[in-house]
Amino acid sequence: MKNLERLFAEKLLKIKAIKLQPANPFTWASGWKSPFYCDNRKTLSYPSLRSFVKFEITRLVLERFGQVDAIAGVATGAIPQGALVADALNLPFVYVRSTPKDHGLENLIEGELRPGMKVVVVEDLISTGGSSLKAVEAIRRDGCEVIGMVAAYTYGFPVAEQAFKDAKVPLVTLTNYEAVLDVALRTGYIEEEDIATLNEWRKDPAHWETGK
């Protein structure tokens, strides 16, 4: 396991951004029930951790993608993270809505991109990958090239990994499900018996049910 994955997992657990509720699962926008929830937006309320996330995402953008013309954040969770990274890199920033505004200019992309720009998308969390890749499609329709995506966290579902592969979008993340579970177990945040529930959910999250 990479040091960054473990380190960020430790930081998320320290601020209680990881929630485990097998008996009272969370419902995601996709409709999936989940005993596990990562609320990494809480990092915004901790200045030192906010700076850590900005620095590490910025570093990954530079190391993995080289020449970048603009940063795009996926609304709403990745707007602040994306803006911080764009500021650190002195690059233009835009954010992509899930749906166009129903008034005014009815924009889907807020900000200005020019055709031919090389864009890196910043996302706060990857689950199924659906909303993230819709943002990619919107940017491509504007005539820009999406050269990659950096996310703070991913659940690492096979359906998402395949979707990113099909869309030809390289994805890098600060941490992931496996790293969080490993650190959570070692630090006593979860118990061994919790692992079985979490593993059952991970195998088939679309059909997982409480107590099954």
UniProtKB/Swiss-Prot annotation:
NCBIfam families registered for this protein in UniProt: pyrE (TIGR00336)
Disulfide pattern: none
Protein name, as recorded = Orotate phosphoribosyltransferase
Presence of the UniProt keyword Magnesium in the record:
yes
Q: From the UniProt record, list the reaction(s) this protein catalyses.
A: orotidine 5'-phosphate + diphosphate = orotate + 5-phospho-alpha-D-ribose 1-diphosphate
**EC number, UniProt record:** 2.4.2.10
A GO biological-process term: pyrimidine nucleobase biosynthetic process
- Which residues are noted in the entry as 5-phospho-alpha-D-ribose 1-diphosphate-binding? R97, K101, H103, E123, D124, L125, I126, S127, T128, G129, G130, S131
Q: Which Gene3D superfamilies match?
A: 3.40.50.2020
* Assembly and interaction partners: Homodimer.
Top-level class of the enzyme under EC nomenclature: transferase
